[in-house]
């Protein structure tokens, strides 16, 4: 069963600067916890159209491919096929100008194959989202 989780953070940078970091998927292994490899399989006009990621975290590893839909105010993605750990995944970053930078909302819907009690699964998803937003904020603000 797929669960949806979301969280929002404000980053002290323009939406364009935030989107530039999100678009640079091949750099994710440098600053994103758990991602060891990111390969652009298919480039796109506004950003990578298809990317294969290799992840390893908490004793679990997986390789998965996402297709992206880039917009001026964010990006959405979807898992191309089930993997060892995931049945499905959709997500998005929505960027909105804010008084003190950019408000970034991360939405993630995942259906995982690893059996987990509902409350534990939701807690894990919330942890993934919060960690991703904190890492994104740190990366963007370090490049200013």
Named regions from a protein language model:
Residues 18-22, 28, 51, 77, ...:
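Hydrophobic pocket/interface hotspot
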Residues 5-9, 93, 106-108:
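A structural signal for short, well-ordered beta-strand segments
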Residues 109-144:
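A conserved amphipathic terminal alpha-helix motif
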Residues 29-30, 40-44, 54-101, 109-111, ...:
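Hydrophobic-ligand binding "helix-grip"
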Residues 37-41, 50, 124-126, 141:
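Juxtamembrane/interface motifs at transmembrane-helix termini
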Residues 23, 90, 119-120:
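Generic recognition of short, well-ordered alpha-helical segments
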């Amino acid at each position: 069963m797929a669960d949806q989780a979301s969280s929002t953070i404000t980053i002290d940078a323009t939406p364009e600067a935030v989107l530039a970091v999100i678009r640079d998927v091949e750099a994710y292994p440098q600053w994103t916890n758990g991602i060891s490899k990111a390969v652009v399989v298919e480039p796109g006009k506004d950003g990578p159209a298809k990317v294969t990621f290799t992840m390893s975290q908490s004793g679990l590893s997986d390789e998965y491919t996402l297709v992206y839909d880039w917009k001026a105010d964010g990006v959405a993605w979807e898992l191309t096929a089930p993997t060892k750990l995931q049945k499905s995944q959709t997500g998005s970053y929505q960027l909105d100008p804010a008084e003190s930078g950019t408000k970034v909302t991360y939405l993630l819907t995942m259906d995982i194959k690893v059996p987990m009690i509902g409350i534990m699964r939701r807690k894990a998803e919330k942890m993934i989202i919060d960690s991703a937003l904190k890492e994104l904020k740190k990366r963007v603000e370090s490049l200013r």
